[in-house]
Amino acid sequence: QHWEKNFSNKPEMFGLEPSISAIKALEIFKEKKITNIIELGAGLGRDTIFFAQNSIKVHALDYSPSSIKIIKEKSKKNNLDHLISTEIFDIRKKLRQDSGKYGGCYSHMLYCMALSSFELLKLNDEIYRILNHQGINIYTVRNENDGDYKNGIHRGEDMYENDGFIVHFFSKDKVKSLLKGFKNLSIEKFNEGNFPRKLYFVVNKKI
């Protein structure tokens, strides 16, 4: 609700260009010959559009109705409706998709939202279920080197609230705790934005 209230009024707050993580993810999807992915927490669709422009079929999920509306508008404007489908969805629930449906899953900063470790484990199980044999899950999270870590109101585990937003910060151990059914291929550090946010770029392969 906080996201909906703040970002739907400033629809280009995260920029129009694809994120660094989407550019890196595309290389991996292309290398693995993955052509259909699910994107969780698609936001305003800057990465969704980028993937589709590079011939990847994307099913974009987001909790915010206004975000999904913006993605649909962008998809239509860019003549990408044949490659982009959307769904308003709360990822704390069981995903509606069939088992083994996707070659890849992508999410940028979804795992570091206000989700408990238990909710993250359940989400990871669902991602495992919907990925096909040797499917790839790529996600990014803000890490313990981020300037906001341990700032603001502590909300349990490694979650801190700043300006109304709760962020779940990740250590490498926390990344490794989410490997049930997966093999980690890489954990890479990168920065984003002017602050900058300090993140991990995580690539896991279904086994």
Located regions from the model:
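A short glycine-rich, Lys/Arg-flanked "PGG" loop and its adjoining helix->strand segment in the class I
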Residues: 121-133
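Class I (Rossmann-like) S-adenosyl-L-methionine-dependent methyltransferase catalytic domain
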Residues: 1-30, 38-94, 122, 136-207
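A conserved beta-strand element that flanks and buttresses the S-adenosyl-L-methionine
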Residues: 106
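Short catalytic micro-motifs in class I SAM-dependent methyltransferases
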Residues: 109-113, 118
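Phosphate-coordination loops involved in phosphoryl transfer and adenosine-cofactor binding
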Residues: 34
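Short amphipathic alpha-helix with an adjacent loop that forms part of the alpha/beta core around
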Residues: 94-100
